[in-house]
């Protein structure tokens, strides 16, 4: 059954739109981005491209909140963001519109309308970084932007043993100088899980934590490889 409401009073089109909170899951190739966050120097960033697309769609500046910031050259398989906007659009319309305005190295995998209290950063339970090592005598032209080439022998047994020492809560204060802005509140992070797998010449390291300091994931991998 369709119901149509009729009013003799003039309708305010803005007042007729409700505030919505959209949660988006992104995938992106970070090769040509200077990280997630918008830079004052105007470098190309993921957040910058997202907000440019939203400006095209909604004709106004939209503040985007991310679950975390990725550094230059870091890719994402499931970055979660959210933004609030007064709109009649539904999730699939937002996804379609953003896809038409975004470059090919950013993909919107999913869009949901969530409660107004949802916050991509504060409601994130954990974050997982995947570090991929190509462990053979020669590099890969095809995969060079998606792995770290390491031609020397790696002792996986020792690596897994060293990984256990990082599990649990640790104070990474030694990273504070390199990440002064992000570490000004707390340098304590909880490493929940480290999973190391090898298939053929590929070693994959998944590190799950409640948060990461600047390039801490790289330092952890290097320490485990020593």
Predicted regions: what they are:
Residues 2-226:
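Structured-RNA-binding interfaces characteristic of tRNA pseudouridine synthases
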């Amino acid at each position: 059954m369709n119901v149509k409401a009729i009013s003799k009073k003039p309708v305010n089109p803005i007042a007729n739109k409700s505030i919505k909170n959209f949660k988006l899951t992104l995938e992106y190739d970070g090769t040509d981005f200077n990280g997630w966050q918008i830079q004052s120097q105007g470098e190309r960033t993921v957040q910058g491209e997202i907000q440019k697309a939203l400006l095209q769609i909604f004709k106004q500046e939209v503040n985007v909140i991310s679950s975390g910031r990725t550094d230059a050259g870091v890719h994402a398989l499931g970055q979660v963001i959210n933004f609030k906007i007064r709109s009649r659009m539904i999730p699939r319309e937002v996804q379609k519109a953003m896809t038409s305005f975004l470059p090919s190295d950013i993909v919107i995998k999913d869009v949901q309308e969530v409660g107004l209290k949802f916050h991509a950063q504060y409601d994130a339970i954990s974050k997982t970084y995947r570090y991929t090592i190509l462990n053979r005598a020669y590099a890969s032209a095809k995969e060079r932007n998606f792995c770290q080439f390491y031609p020397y022998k790696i002792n996986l047994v020792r690596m897994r043993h060293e990984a256990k020492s990082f599990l649990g809560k640790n104070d990474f204060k030694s990273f504070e100088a390199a990440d002064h802005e992000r570490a000004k509140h707390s340098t304590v992070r909880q490493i929940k899980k480290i999973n190391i797998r090898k298939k053929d010449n590929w070693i994959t390291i998944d590190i799950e934590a409640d948060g990461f300091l600047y390039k801490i994931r790289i330092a952890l991998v290097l320490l485990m490889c020593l």
